[in-house]
Amino acid sequence: MAVAVFRTRLWRPDPNRSARWNRGAYLVRAVGHCGECHTPRSLLGGVDPDRELGGNPKGPEGKRVANITPHRKKGIGDWSESDIASYLLDGGLPDGDLASGAMVEVIEDSTSRLTEYDRRAIANYLKSVPPQDGN
């Protein structure tokens, strides 16, 4: 009989980080559960914590989901915090393109309704995570 062990990943504030960073971490990791789509899955089907937010080649709709880490070539490393906050408000990408796929609904029904402070807190957190070379 095989037994699989899954780690429960509860979000806890980091006392060594700012209130803004902790708010962003909370919104990304707990409330928004961004990693459910933006993190690749392990062989057992759970999100791979070693590649957190590094993009998913086959997301929930079977399509590629973007790397949202600060990787300069494969992620959003060239985006400013303002670029990220603006994208979460209206879906506009820095290059003039628009959000597509499931992110349209996420933006319309969720992130566009956040306060500016919360959108900037998310941006601050995303700029701080380790860059991932995936997707």
Ranges and model annotations:
Residues 1-30, 76:
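Electrostatic cytochrome c docking/interface patches
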